[in-house]
């Protein structure tokens, strides 16, 4: 914002007049739900008060030259630009657009059904940071409503938020108006909390129909299911202490280039994620940034 300070003296000098001198300052600060904010030094504002000085010999008027307009600074919400180098094929695998220039030995990490609780979410985020990995967190609207602070944390930690419907219902069994509501409400609440609108969509249970796909497309959402299921959600018959290793075993058995790996915000997944990512790296895999995926596929 350009602010100009002009101290104006009297145009006509009169003997015995009072000399006026204004002093004042104003500092503004702003806050946002964006991932981070940048403080900006305040510029003195127009004089707010006028004090009466002793009678002195009148002084000539003084005009402070107009300050130059400062160069605009980058917005605190500005994100790193990521080149579009991958696309999703019909099997929901992530493949390079240019196979000669872009590695094909990558996996896409995704986590469904959050945000649930800090105790599970924080270890997931910490592990992703440790491996410099990005993931899509497909969230449910009713959970975002209960824990907006957790959604904000996902965003502030640099991860990507996807739409997973409001109530986690089988959308393939619903009519268009219900589908519209389920997707639209999630778009709205994520935008309200983070200032960003999701661009990825995964239907719960992979349940879909033509209306689901069309409505998702109308909202600018890239529809996907997965190509590698960790089965971390299907552990009722697995002893608790064996579940972390079972997640790794399931992923490794289905591993392929471009794996679109489905996981959830579950305790055993959080416990084993570091080990899983380490093993993937040892096999030569890297983690694709979701922002590098072409949304027009």
Could you describe each region identified by the protein language model?
Residues 1-4:
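Positively charged n-region of N-terminal signal peptides that target proteins for export
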Residues 6-7, 25-100:
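N-terminal, intrinsically disordered, polar/charged segments of Gram-positive cell-envelope systems
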Residues 17-20:
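C-terminal motif of bacterial Sec signal peptides marking the signal peptidase cleavage site
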Residues 76-170, 182, 187-189, 196:
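Active-site beta->alpha N-cap acidic-glycine motif
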Residues 93-101, 131, 268-297:
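C-terminal domain-boundary segment and adjacent tail
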Residues 107-110, 135-139, 160-163, 199-203, ...:
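Structural recognition of the beta-strand scaffold that forms the well-ordered cores
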Residues 114-118, 139-147, 169-174, 202-208, ...:
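Acidic-and-aromatic substrate-binding clefts and catalytic sites of carbohydrate-active enzymes
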Residues 119, 169-194, 207-256:
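Alpha-helical scaffold elements lining the catalytic groove of polysaccharide deacetylases
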């Amino acid at each position: 914002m350009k602010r100009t300070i002009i101290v104006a003296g009297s145009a006509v000098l009169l003997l015995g007049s009072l000399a006026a001198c204004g002093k004042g300052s104003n500092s503004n600060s702003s806050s946002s739900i964006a991932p981070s904010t940048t403080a900006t030094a305040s510029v003195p504002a127009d004089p707010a008060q006028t004090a009466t000085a002793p009678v002195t010999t009148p002084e000539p008027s003084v005009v402070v030259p107009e300050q130059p307009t400062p160069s605009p600074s980058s917005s605190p919400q500005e994100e790193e630009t990521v080149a579009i180098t991958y696309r999703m094929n019909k099997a929901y695998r992530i493949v390079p657009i240019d196979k000669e220039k872009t590695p094909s030995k990558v996996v896409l990490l995704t986590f469904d059904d959050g945000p649930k609780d800090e105790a599970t979410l924080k270890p997931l985020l910490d592990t992703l940071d440790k491996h410099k990995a990005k993931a899509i967190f497909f969230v449910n609207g009713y959970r975002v409503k209960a824990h907006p602070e957790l959604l904000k944390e996902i965003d502030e930690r640099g991860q990507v938020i996807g739409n997973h419907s409001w109530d986690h219902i089988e959308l393939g069994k619903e009519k268009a108006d219900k589908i519209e509501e389920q997707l639209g409400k999630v778009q709205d609440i994520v935008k309200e909390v983070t200032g960003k609108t999701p661009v990825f969509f995964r239907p719960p249970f992979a349940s879909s129909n033509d209306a689901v796909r069309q409505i998702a497309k109308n909202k600018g959402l890239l529809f996907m299911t997965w190509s590698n299921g960790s089965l971390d959600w299907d552990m009722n018959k697995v002893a608790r202490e064996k579940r972390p290793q079972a997640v790794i075993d399931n992923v490794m058995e289905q591993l392929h280039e471009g794996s679109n790996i489905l996981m959830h915000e579950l305790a055993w997944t959080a416990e084993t994620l570091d080990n899983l990512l380490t093993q993937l790296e040892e096999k030569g895999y890297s983690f694709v940034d979701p922002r590098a995926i072409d949304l027009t596929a």
